[in-house]
Amino acid sequence: MATRVTVGEPLRWAVVRVALDPATGHEQGGTRRALVVSYEPFHRSGLATVCPITAARDEARYPGEVAIPVGTAGQTRPGLILCQQVRTISLERVVGAPDGRLADPGLRRAVRLALAHHLGLDTPAVGDGALVRD
């Protein structure tokens, strides 16, 4: 699959389109938007860690979900960043160029906290950015 992202391109907090099939069970599948949450040195491996974005709902129901408003990083409808669906993918699954970036510090913090909660990490250190800086 052709991609327009290259190793070394800043991707953390970018919203990209990814081809997630094949998916099994309750995994998010299809080609959809996703938020890149992994840090830059990891991308040199040709991989990225992403959280899928859905436009099916606009209110978080679970601690692993973060609402993403219309107009944020190219979002055309209200949606949710599904931090409980976090997965590592090959950069070859990225379709086209990034749609935009999640620039809002409050949303970034909410994503960090949702990931920390889902993974059972110490949320105060993650939430204030002490472990990994932008």
Model-derived segments and their meaning:
Residues M1-D134:
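Conserved functional hotspots at enzyme active or ligand-binding sites that engage polyanionic ligands
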